[in-house]
Amino acid sequence: MMSKLGVLLTICLLLFPLTAVPLDGDQPADRPAERMQDDISSENHPMFDAIRGCCMPLSCMLLCEPCCG
């Protein structure tokens, strides 16, 4: 009985391998560079001043880059 089950499992894996399953292209794991860029962007920091193009002087201590001093 176990050998028949093993043969059936082997045939199923040969006919439909697990790598043939299509992956969702919208997964963030598929694009790690974009995900990292979005996470560390200083423009998205709440202390970033878009008009001046830099962070407020006190936010340098809060790891907001670039600082204008």
Swiss-Prot record:
Primary location class: secreted
Superkingdom per UniProt: Eukaryota
Residue numbers covered by the propeptide annotation in the UniProt entry: 21-52
GO MF annotations, alphabetized: ion channel inhibitor activity; sodium channel regulator activity; toxin activity
Cellular localization per UniProt: Secreted
Record's protein name: Mu-conotoxin-like Am3.3
Residues recorded as bearing Cysteine amide in the entry: 68
Signal peptide stretch: 1-20
Organism the protein comes from: Conus amadis
GO CC terms in record: extracellular region
PTM entry text: Is not hydroxylated. Contains 3 disulfide bonds.
Keyword Mitochondrion (UniProt): no
Keywords per UniProt: Amidation, Disulfide bond, Ion channel impairing toxin, Neurotoxin, Secreted, Signal, Toxin, Voltage-gated sodium channel impairing toxin
